[in-house]
Amino acid sequence: MEFRKDLGQYIYEYEGLIFAWDEEPEEDIQNTVESLAENYFKNLDVIIDFMLADIKEIYGEVTVEDVKEKLGKPVIDYNNGKVTYYEQSFDDCHIFEFEFMDDAFEDLQYFSIDG
């Protein structure tokens, strides 16, 4: 776990995912991180389907596989229930973000493309 000034958060990287907290967690986070990573990868197609219409609206016809290749590393902000893609490669000026309401990544809301 390290503090990243560019994010203003404590981060922990696991299996290609970045987990972020506003304050350094006091409890052991390994089980939480492992569970979130498993659920994120298990539901990645559902997550992409949730975002796909908005992505197509801006970037044209893209497939689920295109999105998988271009999303980059997600930053999972556990305290705020947000996943942010700062490194997406559709362009160099937008940030993708959505909110998750449960640790299973089954209840997703408020996808946005900001920039």
PLM feature segments, named:
Residues M1-Y14, D66, D77-G115:
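Acidic, proline/glycine-rich low-complexity IDRs
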Residues K42-F96:
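Amphipathic protein-protein interaction modules
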Residues M1-G60:
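Long, contiguous N-terminal structural blocks used for assembly/anchoring
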